[in-house]
Regions:
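Small-residue helix/turn framework positions
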Residues: 1-177
């Protein structure tokens, strides 16, 4: 389900059209989404919200965005490849932890929650997840056996860099690009 509210379009045919509003997508199937892109397999459901969105000349200027696990009971699994790609969005910790430990023998892991937030202002995203920690934020909160928790460490990420990380994670079957 996708709902757009408070949408305002100004100067639509001008040199710098502006679009403002809120987009909400609910209960998206992660299995379908991750099969569409070369990201790694995930099972579950997510909600996506873009509030206070402002596009100028069809490019993002500001928004408050979040991707979070949907409420309800459903299978929650994440592949090692998806863990590595998610790690590339917020830091390299989980990918390195898998490669150094016995966790590398598992292909999939259970999770309790997934969440990533981005507050875009002045071309910089202030990043967050399902919970904050002293070192950063939790992107994937483990649950079940085997489980894994994925942390993000970069609180501020340039918009263009984040878009590049997402493109790299969704367009290749190789490891994440971490700078």
């Amino acid at each position: 389900i996708m709902v757009a509210t408070n949408m305002q379009l100004s100067d639509a045919l001008g040199a710098a059209p502006q679009l403002q509003g809120t987009l909400v997508m609910s209960n998206l199937d992660l299995d379908t989404l991750t099969k569409t892109f070369s990201f790694g397999k995930m099972q579950g459901r997510i909600d996506m919200v873009l509030e206070n969105m402002l596009l100028s000349n069809w490019k993002p200027v500001s928004f408050d965005g979040r991707v979070m696990s949907s409420e309800g009971k459903y299978p929650r699994k994440i592949s090692q490849q998806a863990v590595q790609n998610i790690s590339s969005l917020g830091g390299a910790g989980a990918a390195a932890a898998i490669q150094r430990s016995f966790l590398r023998i598992f292909e999939t892991f259970g999770y309790r929650k997934i969440g990533l937030t981005c507050k875009l202002r002045n071309t910089v995203c202030e990043m967050g997840g399902v919970a904050d920690t002293a070192q950063g934020y939790v992107i994937v909160q483990g649950g079940g056996i085997p489980s894994i928790t994925v942390m993000g460490y970069n609180r501020q990420v340039g918009w263009e860099e984040l878009v590049g990380r997402i493109k790299a994670a969704t367009q290749s079957n190789v490891g994440p690009v971490v700078k």
